[in-house]
Amino acid sequence: MKKQRNLRSMAAQAVEQVVEQGQSLSNILPPLQQKVSDKDKALLQELCFGVLRTLSQLDWLINKLMARPMSGKQRTVHYLIMVGLYQLLYTRIPPHAALAETVEGAIAIKRPQLKGLINGVLRQFQRQQEELLAEFNTSDARYLHPSWLLKRLQKAYPEQWQSIVEANNQRPPMWLRINRTHHSRDSWLALLDEAGMKGFPHADYPDAVRLETPAPVHALPGFEDGWVTVQDASAQGCMTWLAPQNGKHILDLCAAPGGKTTHILEVAPEAQVVAVDIDEQRLSRVYDNLKRLGMKATVKQGDGRYPSQWCGEQQFDRILLDAPCSATGVIRRHPDIKWLRRDRDIPELAQLQSEILDAIWPHLKSGGTLVYATCSVLPEENSLQIKAFLQRTADAELCETGTPEQPGKQNLPGAEEGDGFFYAKLIKK
C-alpha cells in the first residue's frame, strides 16, 4: 500500500523545480506519480499542469496578497500558496478541504511555522476574490504568457495572436492514430462506440480520431495490441507530405519518441526505415513503440549535424526532419514550455535547425522528398527558416506547401483541431 503523501506539497515542489531550476515537467512528474495511489495520480497531475498553465495569474495574485514574496529557503511556500489559489479558482475541491490540505503541506516541506501565514493568505484571497479578479482581468498578466512570447506572437500574428493564446491556455483534446494495418478508421470507431466512448474523425488526416472525452490508454480498444496510438492530429499530418512507399529508404531524423517512425511503417509496412535521435534515453521509447506495434526499424543514436558519423555516405528516398524547436505550438499539452523557454533560445534553435538542414540535405537522393516539420508557431523556426534554406540551396524546390515568398504550411492550435505545427515539403532537383 502506498504511503499517504501530501499532494499539494509535492505539486509545489514540482512546479518550483520547473520554474526555478528549468527542469521539464515530463521528467519530474512520472517518478512523483509512482509514489502515490492511482486515485491521487490524476489530482497530482491536475495540480502541476494547472498551476503551470495559470502561473502568471497566481504570481500576480500573490504579489497583491503579500507585502513581499517568499524567497530563499522559504521559496517553496510561494509555490504551495499558488497550489492553494489554483484549487480555489479552478477545481471542484471544497474550499475548506483545499485550504486544510494546502496548510498541512507546510509540514511536508518542513515549514510548519508558516502554516498560519499560508492559511491567512488563502483566506484573504477568499474575502477579496471578486475585486482582485476584476483588477487582474485588466492586467497584461491575464494572457497567462511570458511577455517575450506574447510580443513574438503579436508580431507574427497581428490578427490571430489572441486566439493562439486562448488555445494555449485550454486543456488539449486527446487525438489518436488508428493503425490502418489492423483496422479501418470506421471499424475502430465502431469498437470505440461498443466500449461506451465517442470519437470524431479528422477531415484531412485519414488515421486521426479525436476522443469526445480523454480516456486512459488501457481503456482504448486494442491499445496493447497496437491497434491505436496516442498522437496529435497535426503530427499525423506529416505523412500527407512525406507519402511513404514500400521498398523506399526512409530516414526519420530527430525521431524520439517514435510516433512518426511507427506511422511511416503503418502507411508503408515494407519501407526500410532508419530512426535517429541524439538522446539515447529517449530512444528507449522508440523501441517501446516499435515493440507494442510489432514493427521493425533500424534505430540509431546520432547528431543530425553530423550524419556521416551514423550513416556514412548513405542516401535516402525520403527524409522526415522533425527539427528540435521551441515547441510553442504544443503549450496546451506542455504548459511548462512557457516557463522553460527564453527569448534568446529562438535564434539559437533557428541556428541549430539550419545546421541540421544543411548537413542532411546531401543524404537525400535526387528526386527525393524531405519534409521539414516543427511543433512551433514562430516564423524564425518555420517559414523564415525554409525561405533562407531555399535561397542558399540551388537544388532544393518547394513542393505543395506554400510559396517561395511564404513557404510551408502553418497549423495553429485550435480547440477541436490539432496542435500548432509547421510543414514544408522539399524536393531535390
From Swiss-Prot:
Its EC number is 2.1.1.176. GO terms for biological process: regulation of DNA-templated transcription; rRNA base methylation. Its main location: cytoplasm. It is an enzyme of class 2 (transferase). It catalyses: cytidine(967) in 16S rRNA + S-adenosyl-L-methionine = 5-methylcytidine(967) in 16S rRNA + S-adenosyl-L-homocysteine + H(+). InterPro entries: MeTrfase_RsmB-F_NOP2_cat, MeTrfase_RsmB-F_NOP2_dom, NusB-like_sf, NusB_RsmB_TIM44, RCMT, rRNA_ssu_MeTfrase_B, rRNA_ssu_MeTfrase_B_ent, RsmB-like_ferredoxin. The keyword tRNA-binding does not apply. GO terms for molecular function: RNA binding; rRNA (cytosine-C5-)-methyltransferase activity. Keywords: Cytoplasm, Methyltransferase, RNA-binding, rRNA processing, S-adenosyl-L-methionine, Transferase. The keyword RNA-binding applies. PROSITE patterns: NOL1_NOP2_SUN, SAM_MT_RSMB_NOP. It is found in: Cytoplasm. S-adenosyl-L-methionine binds at C254, A255, A256, P257, G258, G259, K260, D277, D303, D322. GO terms for cellular component: cytosol. It holds the Pfam family Methyltr_RsmB-F. Specifically methylates the cytosine at position 967 (m5C967) of 16S rRNA. Belongs to the class I-like SAM-binding methyltransferase superfamily. RsmB/NOP family. This is Ribosomal RNA small subunit methyltransferase B. The lineage of its organism: Bacteria, Pseudomonadati, Pseudomonadota, Gammaproteobacteria, Enterobacterales.
